[in-house]
């Protein structure tokens, strides 16, 4: 619906303006709005960019987001049987721009699919990604933790 899309774009622009003014990164969850999302992010030209959270798009969108400074965060969806395009993204995202999440309480990773998702399942996602990328769990955990702290500097004090 055009009115709804226009309202969402206006609201998103306000959020992006707030991020620019405060110097904070943005956390973006986008569905079925790929072109609009990328256009608005490019237009905003944020100095601190942010993260495309619970990413479910293809490598083309991931590459476009990476090119403007964004991180890509993968959830339990990457473990789903029908998520081959997302696994390709997981293989290609530079390790210094990768984040891992659960998106609780939904989208529990295999082997917990069909149950409520819990924050502790982030380890399952990270273990899956480590195998997929051919690195140890420890390496992946260390790198994604460093990425998180770089993107959200205040997390260093916690």
Language-model-detected regions and their locations in the chain:
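Short secondary-structure capping/turn micro-motifs that flank functional sites
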Residues: 35-36, 81-82, 146
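Non-cysteine beta-strand/loop elements that form the S-adenosyl-L-methionine
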Residues: 96-104
